[in-house]
């Protein structure tokens, strides 16, 4: 299952979105993953319905059947690039009012990069920091937020509801990641990480119901925006040819590092009896990532190959 998810969802969907679209690249990727978020949000009620009326085996058979149908449809209908069908990105539509008019020239430069060249750049290293900065706080909140909220006095049902609210708001954040079509995508990422950091710090004030809601909303919104902005920045910097490999490498590294967040937060809580240190640390990690995003600039043309004597 994990291998199938890795091969068939995040990296391929991001790759196809940026292969086919340029001027509305962020919006397209945002819509794709917003629908993924909606499906994820529906899993729990559908799961409960299946268990109430059937049994768990029926649920898994249904998932397998849907997966096979979608795999066949994708194989029959989806094409990797518009050029494979005699088309071009965006259908060669001229820029619309309000969009960025520097996208196409930069894309022509970015498409010259190879993955081997891209992973050696400072921009790639900074994007690894940004990847950890947006995913570690959200992963940690999902794992520990219910316990923290009950510790500060909220009923268990309220705590669970706030965690669900955070996930739901992240869906809207993914659509808001479309801001990267109108402004520099690295600035959209910087704003997203700043918001997520505010939310992580705001969890220190979560004893108040209103402030708890604001905090989880900021985390969800910032995470959703960053989730879309990161692949858009990669496409903006390194183009189509290098995208899938650099994204796979980035997600592997940041997945391991960000996965340590819940574990480290648990260690901090066991040592101190409080989540204060963990939430302050996550806030600083977010803001460090935001600073990295704001500092990044387009890498320009790739280095010319060296000529051996």
Regions found by a protein language model. Name each.
Residues 5-21, 225-238:
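Intracellular juxtamembrane helix-capping segments at the cytosolic ends
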Residues 173-184, 269-270:
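Helix-to-loop junctions at the C-terminal end of transmembrane segments
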Residues 65-102, 292-297:
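C-terminal membrane-cytosol helix-exit motif in multi-pass small-molecule transporters
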Residues 40, 237-272:
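A late C-terminal transmembrane helix in Major Facilitator Superfamily
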Residues 1-8, 132, 211-225:
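Hydrophobic core of transmembrane alpha-helices in multi-pass small-molecule transporters
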